[in-house]
């Protein structure tokens, strides 16, 4: 990720349309055979007056496998300071070295849909905020605040000092994720790397380690699925409290 920001290159119809709606698109590469399609014309209209290049095939310049005929060069998005994610209603997803950018994008999409207030990612040894992540996020990374930090354990300490409870997802924990009362408080859910789980240092910073209950004999869930379940459980718990009379 560039020091000045992320999201410089975006690919795919939904991701580029979201970047255009956010006013970030500076240049578009569009396949000639698709230029008159309604979805492409809509993107061009949303982008205002971008520099437009018509090409035979965008795949040779694309990072993603299926760019859907459109690639955009964009003004970068600036990360938010970590401290801006704390507060009374904080609901954060911290990614402990997630490596697959498609998982990163999928988690961002679920987090936004569940009303989470921000995401924390590592600048090192982790999936970049790349075109692949943006395509998987389908516009979510245009909206949800992202803090980019050098150390996840250090970030968790800072969040704790800011009054945020830290809940780590750990398949081996005997504590059930569903119904955790601290989800009504400022909280950050920590999702570990694919196939590895939480790092030792990240796990030590957690106030609670919790697992997703599963049927006997089933394998652990994908990181993005686990994150989605945690995000929507936070939403469910908070709504159940707000809907309680008195």
Protein language model features and the residues they cover:
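RNA substrate-binding interface of SAM-dependent RNA methyltransferases
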Residues: 24, 51, 87-174
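Short amphipathic alpha-helix with an adjacent loop that forms part of the alpha/beta core around
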Residues: 82-87, 158-160, 178-183
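Active-site/ligand-binding-proximal alpha/beta "capping" segment
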Residues: 167-222
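Structured adenosyl-cofactor binding patch, chiefly the S-adenosyl-L-methionine
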Residues: 17, 22, 113, 132-140, ...
């Amino acid at each position: 990720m560039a020091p000045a920001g992320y999201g410089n290159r975006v690919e795919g119809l939904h991701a580029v349309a979201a970047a255009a709606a956010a006013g970030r698109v500076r240049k578009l590469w569009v396949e000639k055979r698709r230029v008159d399609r309604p979805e492409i014309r809509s993107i061009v209209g949303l982008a205002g007056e971008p520099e437009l290049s018509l090409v035979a095939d965008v795949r040779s310049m694309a990072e993603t496998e299926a760019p859907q005929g459109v690639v955009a060069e964009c003004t970068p998005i600036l990360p938010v300071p970590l401290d801006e994610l704390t507060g009374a209603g904080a609901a954060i997803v911290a990614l402990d070295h997630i490596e697959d950018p498609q998982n990163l994008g999928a988690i961002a999409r679920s987090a936004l849909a569940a009303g989470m207030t921000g995401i924390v990612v590592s600048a090192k040894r982790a999936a970049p905020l790349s075109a692949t992540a943006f395509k998987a996020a389908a516009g979510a990374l245009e909206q949800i605040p992202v803090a980019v930090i050098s150390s996840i354990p250090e970030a968790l300490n800072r969040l704790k000092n800011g009054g945020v409870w830290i809940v780590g997802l750990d398949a081996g924990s005997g504590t059930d994720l569903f119904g955790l009362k601290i989800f009504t408080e400022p909280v950050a859910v920590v999702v570990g790397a694919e196939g590895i789980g939480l790092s030792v240092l990240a796990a030590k910073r957690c106030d609670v380690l919790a697992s997703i209950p599963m049927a006997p004999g089933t394998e652990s869930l994908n990181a993005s699925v686990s994150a989605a379940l945690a995000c929507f459980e936070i939403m469910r718990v908070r709504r159940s409290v707000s809907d309680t009379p008195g």
